[in-house]
UniProtKB/Swiss-Prot annotation:
Protein name according to UniProt: Hemagglutinin
Alphabetized UniProt keyword annotations: Clathrin- and caveolin-independent endocytosis of virus by host, Clathrin-mediated endocytosis of virus by host, Disulfide bond, Fusion of virus membrane with host endosomal membrane, Fusion of virus membrane with host membrane, Glycoprotein, Hemagglutinin, Host cell membrane, Host membrane, Host-virus interaction, Lipoprotein, Membrane, Palmitate, Signal, Transmembrane, Transmembrane helix, Viral attachment to host cell, Viral envelope protein, Viral penetration into host cytoplasm, Virion, Virus endocytosis by host, Virus entry into host cell
Function: Binds to sialic acid-containing receptors on the cell surface, bringing about the attachment of the virus particle to the cell. This attachment induces virion internalization either through clathrin-dependent endocytosis or through clathrin- and caveolin-independent pathway. Plays a major role in the determination of host range restriction and virulence. Class I viral fusion protein. Responsible for penetration of the virus into the cell cytoplasm by mediating the fusion of the membrane of the endocytosed virus particle with the endosomal membrane.
Residues at the site labelled Cleavage: 344-345
Modifications after synthesis and translation: Palmitoylated. In natural infection, inactive HA is matured into HA1 and HA2 outside the cell by one or more trypsin-like, arginine-specific endoprotease secreted by the bronchial epithelial cells. One identified protease that may be involved in this process is secreted in lungs by club cells.
Gene: HA
Length: 566
């Protein structure tokens, strides 16, 4: 019996064996990502794909200043509203910035035909040449070119008129028929603007044009229209009962435009030879101009970012990330960040069998921790770590490139559709944005899932690599660890890590230690059986004595009557 108790004590007080564990890196990162199956997974490393910051300013784009219209609208600028004279010196720009409620537009009330289409055309123009298409003094010798002014277009307290148009009126009591043509020799598209006056009464018609019935005809190879003034009393706008309707056309190089009229023509004075540039545009913004330079401009402010997506604003000019409605697009590049809990011990489930990562391993993603008589320490597996880094880096770069290529192509297609259809329905725009957002989010979710699975697989592969080397020279003790059946010094540990472990060298020692441990287990089982019997008998005796004592006490105080019948 004494021998058996001695064996039990030996089993309970066995010394710590040499161990090696497979694990992964952990740190103090609080980055979280979403996957297809999980939300807010904490990871060691990740990259943000969504830009949500701007500077709140209007900036130059690649060193080129925008054309800031200030209090003028596109209409006021291009027609030549007298209050917009300061803009006439601007010959080129990176984009056009217009305020939401511009004061100076069409100073004389009337309808601007195809105004939205004109804005669309000007949005792709980065510079123009403003030139006299019909010089004021020499083009209209039989008509008055100075009396056509109005208080509605006053400038510095005096009646005036548009700086790019001429209001032709009677001269010396007559308004002769006119015919004027222009041949576009600019080798560029030329924007030509004109107007047709609609008086409020016949008296004004006779006074200004000396006839009751008049017409205006404008003809080119792509434009053919005849206008008849509509004389009618109208509500006053800017103290005017009359109206001027404004028209425009684009004249191709070599094409000719012909104006014929016998009254009511608001003639072109200046025209514009257009130079189109990729990346120009028109934005409506209250942001102020600043001395800054950027690659991307939105109505909210400038963005300086190389990220593929942004949620600042759907309207962008320049080299901009694609707009999506997402609030978070973060792609994982590292591992699940689950630092090991001290109460569980050092090792401890990224791959399903390891409970936590190691903050002590800082030079790699996957690696080892060993413990022997010479001490303990961490060592990263550089090969598997570097292969993983290369693979994930290439994948992230490829995905970003695919995202940019995909959405840029879609963006170009929509721009073409906008010109053909003139206006995209807002619901259609919203639908496309939803598709872009869904595609971006789904792609990130799928790739995050794949990356985390990839890390799991790498840890498992490292574990299987060690297991296949050690075979039965060590036993699996859980949490990614192995306990050696033999002494394993630092040289031995290094051989396991680099894949050169000599299994036969340690087989005999392992076999002997394994047999000893198995013997101890068998002896221990016998001892445990004896202890179990003793424990059962002792417990029964204690129970019987307790019951007897209680019965005696109850009989003595009359709570329990005992009768013996013979």
């Amino acid at each position: 019996m004494k021998a058996k108790l001695l064996v039990l004590l030996c089993a309970l007080s066995a010394t710590d064996a040499d161990t090696i564990c497979i694990g992964y890196h952990a740190n103090n990162s609080t980055d979280t990502v979403d996957t297809v199956l999980e939300k807010n997974v904490t990871v060691t490393h990740s990259v943000n794909l969504l830009e949500d910051n701007h500077n709140g300013k209007l900036c130059k784009l690649k060193g080129i200043a925008p054309l800031q219209l200030g209090k003028c609208s596109i209409a006021g600028w291009i027609l030549g509203n007298p209050e917009c004279e300061s803009l006439f010196s601007k010959k080129s720009w990176s984009y056009i910035a217009e305020t939401p409620n511009s004061e100076n537009g069409t100073c004389y009330p009337g309808y601007f035909a195809d105004y939205e289409e004109l804005r669309e055309q000007l949005s792709s123009v980065s510079s123009f040449e403003r030139f006299e298409i019909f010089p004021k003094e020499s083009s209209w010798p039989k008509h008055n070119v100075t009396k056509g002014v109005t208080a509605a277009c006053s400038h510095k307290g005096k009646s005036s008129f548009y700086r790019n148009l001429l209001w032709l009126t009677e001269k010396n009591g007559s308004y002769p028929n006119l015919s004027k043509s222009y041949v576009n020799n600019k080798e560029k598209e030329v924007l030509v603007l004109w107007g047709v006056h609609h008086p409020s009464n016949i008296e004004d018609q006779k006074t200004i044009y000396r006839k009751e019935n008049a017409y205006v005809s404008v003809v080119s190879s792509h434009y053919n229209r005849r206008f008849t003034p509509e004389i009618a009393k109208r509500p006053k706008v800017r103290n005017q009962e009359g109206r001027i309707n404004y028209y425009w056309t684009l004249l191709e190089p070599g094409d000719t435009i012909i104006f014929e009229a016998n009254g009511n023509l608001i003639a072109p004075w200046y025209a514009f030879a257009l130079s189109r540039g990729f990346g120009s545009g028109i934005i409506t913004s209250n942001a102020s101009m600043d001395e800054c330079d950027a690659k991307c401009q939105t109505p909210q402010g400038a963005i300086n970012s190389s990220l593929p997506f942004q949620n600042v604003h759907p309207v962008t000019i320049g080299e901009c990330p694609k707009y999506v409605r997402s609030t978070k697009l973060r792609m994982v590049t590292g591992l699940r960040n689950i630092p090991s809990i001290q109460s569980r011990g050092l090792f401890g489930a990224i791959a399903g069998f390891i409970e936590g990562g190691w903050t002590g391993m800082i030079d790699g993603w996957y690696g080892y921790h060993h413990q022997n008589e010479q001490g303990s320490g961490y060592a990263a597996d550089q090969k598997s770590t570097q292969n993983a880094i290369n693979g994930i880096t290439n994948k992230v770069n490829s995905i970003i490139e695919k995202m940019n290529t995909q959405f840029t192509a879609v963006g170009k297609e929509f721009n073409k559709l906008e010109k053909r259809m003139e206006n995209l329905n807002k619901k259609v725009d919203d639908g496309f944005l939803d598709i872009w957002t869904y595609n971006a989010e789904l792609l990130v979710l799928l790739e995050n899932e794949r990356t985390l699975d990839f890390h799991d697989s790498n840890v498992k592969n490292l574990y299987e690599k060690v297991k296949s080397q050690l075979k039965n020279n060590a036993k699996e003790i859980g949490n990614g660890c192995f306990e050696f059946y033999h002494k394993c010094n630092n040289e031995c540990m290094e051989s396991v890590k680099n894949g050169t472990y000599d299994y036969p060298k340690y087989s005999e020692e392992s076999k002997l230690n394994r047999e000893k441990i198995d013997g101890v287990k068998l002896e221990s089982m016998g001892v445990y059986q004896i202890l179990a019997i003793y424990s059962t008998v002792a417990s029964s005796l204690v129970l019987l004595v307790s019951l007897g004592a209680i019965s005696f006490w109850m009989c003595s105080n009359g709570s329990l009557q005992c009768r013996i019948c013979i």
